[in-house]
Amino acid sequence: KHFPQGTAAPETAVPAVPELPDAADLPAFSIDDAETSEIDDALSVQDLPGGGKRVGIHIAVPTLAIAENSPIETIIKQRQSTAYYPGGKITMLPDNWIQTFSLDEGKRPVLSLYVEVGEDFQVASTPQTRLENLTIKHNLRIQDIEPHFNADTGLSENEPVQFPCQPQLRWLYRFAVERQKQRDRYEENRTPQYDYG
């Protein structure tokens, strides 16, 4: 009775996305649960010539195609967000919009934020943002990588690589640990945190 017209958002035509420059060839990847159908963010880690890394955070941008007072804007105002419940969800966007803008493997429009990080794990540049087309190389799934990348295994460079982008994840893990240490927030033997969401 709460959804007399059903829970699916009505299919609405997706306008042409504005022309965007192509990003550099980056090893961009996403990490999500196996059930995730709306992949809205991705990461990249690129080696810099003088040492250090350039870290990219890439966000899906369906707003590129949302015009004021358009049918899709009306749907979004009605729904406001994706609603999650145990065992399922009601998406804010229609399926054809999700398929167009989800960061599945392949070339996708994104809003990217780039920052350079030195070998000492200090942020070495002012963040830069760009609207661009980025080729997502890998959609990693937590259930697939967790057995090979956790507190007990997979973090050392001396261990074999078990899945795509594991070297980049190892570096991001070290970066996170070093930043926590620099902020006096690192807990080596932290009590496990559980997410029941």
Predicted regions: what is each one?
Residues A9-G197:
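Electropositive polyanion-binding surfaces
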Residues K1-F3:
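Boundary/activation segment at the start of structured domains
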